[in-house]
Amino acid sequence: FKVKVSIELHPSVSRDIERTLHYGRRYFKVCPEFFIVKVPLTPEGYLAVRKLTQENIPINFTLGFSARQNYLAARLSNPDFVNVFLGRLNQVVIDHEAGSGDQVGEKVTLSTQSALIEAREKYKDVQSKLIGASIRNGAQVAFLAGLDVLTIPPKAIKEFQESGKATNEVISRLNEEIVPGINNSHPLAKRFPCLWEMPGQFISFVDDLMNENGLDEMQGNELVDFCRKHGMNLFHDFTDTELKQIYDHGKIPCLDNWSESIALDDLMTQSALQSFTKDQNA
């Protein structure tokens, strides 16, 4: 069809910078006119994407679940695209009976879009655009109007087309205060705000990281250590046993099984990565 398509690297290379670079370059050479290389969000992924982007290889940095993950990606790695898998964020609330789940993923997505717009305006080298991924219905298509990119399955676009919404009803909600469908009295409620919040402390952390010498030579473990020293819980050190537990459970984690010290965005990303690994191993 002569259209651009994202070609995802195998998850087995996701924690290896050199292999990510090797296969990223190799995939791109197959069809440079239309291939966008899809790289999963890991410490090594951030650093490999930084290099691939500098080589003008188009990148879709996937498996993002929060504004802060994607803001860091835009500043540090500057991929062409970042993602929020919003449907899964709504579902994790529903699965835990922590609320209706309405507009949870939408709030995260719009917060991410705002953060990226701010980054693009302040830092002229930042060009990353947001993909609203995991769209489930036509209402979400309308609610997220004005987003950089939406990936919409046929069922959802048909619902939108048949909704009868007038053109003047389809407006940008970037500056609106979105109230997510989370029961604030639920024991798990406090685990969700990290998905959409962008505190000044986090922006200062990213500023400090960008001022580090040798970013292009940084290794994944060094990025993890830098985050920990700055009090950022972006990358939990999952044991092999924990990874197997995530692998067996599926895309939506059972939050009751995991310490509150593990950030929800990190847990969702790892669950998505292990789920993709399982699919590839089938």
Walk through the language-model features, giving the residues of each.
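Structural signal for hydrophobic packing residues in well-ordered secondary-structure cores
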Residues: 1, 28-31, 109, 113-120, ...
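Active-site beta->alpha loop and helix N-cap motifs at the rims of alpha/beta catalytic domains
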Residues: 1-44, 49, 54
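A residue-level signal for conserved active-site and pocket-lining positions in enzyme catalytic cores
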Residues: 7, 141, 276
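Residues that cap or flank secondary-structure elements
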Residues: 15, 40, 61-62, 129, ...
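Non-membrane alpha-helical structural segments and their capping/turn regions in soluble enzymes
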Residues: 17-21, 46, 67, 102-110, ...
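Short phosphate-binding/catalytic loops that engage adenosine nucleotides
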Residues: 57
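Catalytic alpha/beta core domains of metabolic enzymes, predominantly
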Residues: 60, 65-211
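C-terminal extensions of enzymes
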Residues: 192-282
